[in-house]
Structure formats: C-alpha cells, structure tokens
Amino acid sequence: RLVEAGAQAIKILLYYNPFDEEQINSVKQAYVERIGAECLGMDVPFFLEPLVYDDAIGNEKGLAFARKKPEYVARAMEEFSKPRYGVDVLKVELPVNPAFVAGTRAFTGEGTAYSRQEAIEHFHNTASATSGPFIYLSAGSTDEVFCEMLELAAEARVKYSGALCGRATWQDAIPVYAREGVTALEGWLADRGLQNVQALNNVLARGATAWWDVYGGKDNIEVIEPNSALRT
C-alpha cells in the first residue's frame, strides 16, 4: 500500500534489546524479516532504525546505560546485517553517549563512561559488526555535538555512508518562533539553520563514504531494471 501511494523506500524504527528474552526478540526479528521480504518483493529499499534499550538498566540517557551502549549497538548492527532480514541501510545510533565522553567538547562532567580514545575504539568496533551500509542518526543531539561525534567516527576510519538528522539542525529555532513568530523563524532558518546544515555537510564530506564503497565501488554494483509487474 505504501508503494502504491508513492513511497520510494521504507523506514522502520525498532526498539531492540539484544539481550532480551528469546521469545520477545524472535517476534521482533520475524517482524523485520517479513518487512524485508516485502520490500524485496516490491523492489524498494529497506531502512531499519534499531534503537537499543534495557529495562533492567533503565534510563537510556544515563551513565549506567552509556557504559553498556557500545555492546548493545554492536549486537543490534550485527543481527540485522544478516541477509535474511533484507535490510539495505541501517540507520544506527552513535555507539557512545556524547555527554559521557571525557576529553570532548560534548562532555558534561556529570560522569565518565569512556575516554576520547575509548570512544574512537567503540566507533571502530561497532562499525566492524556490519558488512552493509549504515548511516548515523543524531537522536536529538545539538548540531555541534553531532558533528564532533562524526569527527570521532572519521578518526576511527569508520566507513559510514552519511547521517540523518532533523532537530539537530533546527531545534534552536523553536524558542525564536515562540518569542518572535514566523518571520523570525524563517530568518533563523535561512541564516543559522543553513550554517548548521553546511557545517554538517562539511563534516560528512571529510568523513563519510558512498554506500557503494561497501561493495567495492560503483563499478561492482549490478543495476537491475525493476519488475513493473510487482507494482501492479
């Protein structure tokens, strides 16, 4: 139905604890597998966004979970990179919580989960968990924090294929709109908002790689004409 309505890709968000009970995760895995099969049948790309959590630890933004997060992200990436799921691109969280990375501008001083070098290693190790293309999501970080974390990914020589962020680039415009209205909002977006996007683009230009590089370059990509019969 989505394809009939004009969708050119499908994106699914999945809350996932890789260490949860098997009966819970087997249902989630079957759900993703079914969507992957349908996307393959309809010849549309499948983007999966797994967000990790653990109810036993609690607060996903807290220090305790921050210390466990790299392993959880790596396990989720490893699982959903398996061919049976048919995921074309993983949209993944940063493997670290920026607030707890000592030695960075993002560090809040409210506890340390990792040093800067350890964070770089976590970027490298989690990226090694998948053999397919993936992009990072900002998860509501500020544009400055998100760009700094992408710079760490570049230091780790991570072959990520870009980023997807929304409010990281425009969230500071909300109070401007509340105080001064639509005209001020549009002015902010045309000025600071544009600067935020350009700054992100500059970071991506230095660190991100094309998705086809994962497969050895564009020349190794076999282009197959879509089967129009599948869309009727």
Q: Predicted segment positions?
A:
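Alpha/beta enzyme core
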Residues: 1-10, 16-45, 53-132, 149-156
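Short hydrophobic alpha-helical runs that function as membrane-insertion/retention elements
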Residues: 11, 46-48, 135, 162
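Alpha-helix boundary/capping detector
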Residues: 29, 179-180, 226-230
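Conserved, mostly hydrophobic/aromatic
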Residues: 49, 90, 166
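Catalytic-face loop-and-helix region of soluble metabolic enzyme cores
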Residues: 93-215, 219
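Charge-patterned, long linear interaction tracts outside catalytic cores
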Residues: 218-232
